[in-house]
């Protein structure tokens, strides 16, 4: 595996869970430009990934100081601008998928590459869904859009490692009807 020399690029750990997967078709949020996106749920126990993201955020902040300064004379402190690394326990307390985890929303105008655990391209859409586990390649960058300042994450590529319980999905027909007693049918 190649050594990453870009301080704003992060490859997450294999226990990262994907949610809100929009990796096959770009989706418009609030009427904006359609983008490919995923919410990356990172266990708090994965301290290596969390530290890599924090380090990349600091590097993006330093690299983007001129952009973050805007028309002002000073750069706002990092703690005063939008940060992509968010605490699931605080921001999504009612969602068990985000318990004891951080999350990062990453998006891109271009489709991410999506591969399996041995780097073969995944072409079957049903193989990638909200709830799978895998690694993600993200790039962290500073932005200043109409005075809205912060650090954001671009989505580069995804590697599915293993299946997981689907998130936010409905029950399958098999699970709804597979255990019913046939004696009651049409009675």
Regions found by a protein language model. Name each.
Residues 117-134, 141-151:
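Exposed beta-sheet edge/beta-hairpin loop segments within beta-rich domains
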């Amino acid at each position: 595996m190649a050594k990453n020399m870009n301080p704003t690029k992060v490859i997450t750990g294999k226990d990262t869970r994907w949610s809100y997967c929009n990796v096959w078709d770009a989706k418009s949020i609030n009427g904006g430009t359609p983008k490919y996106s995923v919410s990356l749920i990172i266990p708090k126990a994965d301290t290596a990934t969390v530290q890599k993201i924090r380090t990349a955020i600091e590097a993006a902040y330093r690299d983007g100081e001129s952009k973050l300064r805007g028309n002002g004379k000073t750069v706002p402190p990092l703690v005063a601008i939008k940060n992509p690394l968010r605490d699931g326990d605080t921001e999504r307390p009612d969602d068990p998928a985000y318990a004891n985890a951080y999350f990062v929303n990453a998006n891109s105008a271009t489709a991410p590459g999506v591969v399996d655990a041995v780097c073969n391209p995944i072409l079957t859409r049903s193989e990638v869904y909200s709830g799978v586990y895998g690694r993600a390649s993200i790039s962290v960058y500073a932005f200043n859009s109409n005075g809205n300042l912060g650090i954001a994450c671009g989505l580069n590529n995804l590697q599915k490692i293993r299946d997981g319980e689907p998130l936010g999905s409905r029950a399958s027909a098999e699970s709804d009807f597979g255990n019913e007693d046939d004696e009651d049918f049409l009675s």
